[in-house]
């Protein structure tokens, strides 16, 4: 009987030790993730700030022509807008991680249509053909968040496409709720990059992304919105063909 009690205590202690080790490993990973996040954030802040300070100092110290002043002001403005975009998206990401949202049943079709319509100027500017295949699909959502999800995914698709590309947006009702498909005929992604694209500040083509004003938070925001809706987001992509 004594041996049995000792055995039970030993098993309980082993289980507690394993749980403690597991929690410590999770905490260690969390700290590493936070460290990586802060490192990426510091880098993203440093680049535009360096440009702003550099051009402001040039204007302060040098006698520039009107054309040179205009060019310097243009760089300061564009980098300032990039900083603003970064701070706004970062605030949104933090809110998504810490706020509770009220869900209500709603049809996705008019909401997706509204999101696509609001992007009409950019779609025309890039000469993008839009294929919409929308049907009634009712599920529990937070309307503003879902619209933000659609806008971010379309924005991401537009950044990958050249003039004359094709954007397809579809929805489909399911037993669990709904599926939304957004596909493009853009440059696509390497297979080994797909698992990383929803990480904050991660960008596949950094030079192209910076030129387009991207800060690497759009898909991280999408990931959080999908998590809040207890859904999942999958990417299928082929280089040179689209995503």
Could you say what each language-model-derived stretch is?
Residues 60-67:
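Short acidic helix/loop segment immediately C-terminal to the autophosphorylated histidine
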Residues 189-203:
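Short conserved segment of the HATPase_c
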Residues 184:
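Acidic ATP/Mg2+-coordinating residue in the GHKL
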Residues 157-158:
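Short helix-loop "hinge" at the ATP-lid/N-box region of the Bergerat-fold HATPase_c
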Residues 78-83:
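Short alpha-helical segment of the dimerization/phosphotransfer core of two-component systems
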Residues 1-38, 53-60, 95, 200, ...:
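Membrane-proximal HAMP signal-relay module
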Residues 122-131:
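Short conserved segments within the C-terminal catalytic ATPase subdomain
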Residues 97-103, 134, 138-144:
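Conserved micro-motifs of the catalytic ATP-binding
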């Amino acid at each position: 009987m004594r041996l049995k009690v000792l055995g039970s205590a030993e098993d309980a202690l082993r289980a507690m030790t394993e749980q403690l080790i597991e929690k410590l490993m999770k905490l260690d990973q969390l700290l590493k993730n936070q460290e990586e996040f802060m490192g990426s954030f510091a880098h993203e802040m440093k680049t535009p700030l360096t440009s702003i300070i550099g051009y402001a100092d040039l204007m302060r110290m040098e006698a520039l022509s009107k054309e040179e002043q205009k060019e310097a002001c243009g760089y300061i403005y564009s980098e300032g807008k990039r900083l603003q975009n970064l701070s706004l998206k970062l605030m949104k990401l933090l809110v998504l991680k810490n706020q509770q949202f009220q869900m209500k049943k709603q049809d996705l079709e008019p909401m997706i249509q509204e999101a696509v319509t609001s992007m009409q100027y950019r779609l025309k500017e890039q000469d993008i053909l839009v294929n919409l295949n929308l049907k009634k699909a009712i599920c529990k959502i937070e309307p503003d968040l879902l619209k933000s999800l659609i806008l971010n995914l379309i924005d991401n698709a537009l950044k990958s496409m050249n003039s004359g590309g094709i954007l397809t947006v579809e929805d489909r009702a399911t037993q669990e709720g709904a599926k939304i498909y957004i596909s493009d005929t853009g440059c696509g992604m390497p297979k080994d990059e797909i698992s990383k694209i929803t990480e904050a500040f991660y960008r596949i083509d950094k030079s192209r992304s910076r030129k387009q004003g991207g800060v690497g938070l759009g898909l991280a925001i999408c990931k959080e919105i999908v998590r809040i809706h207890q859904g999942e987001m999958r990417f299928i992509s082929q280089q040179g063909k689209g995503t």
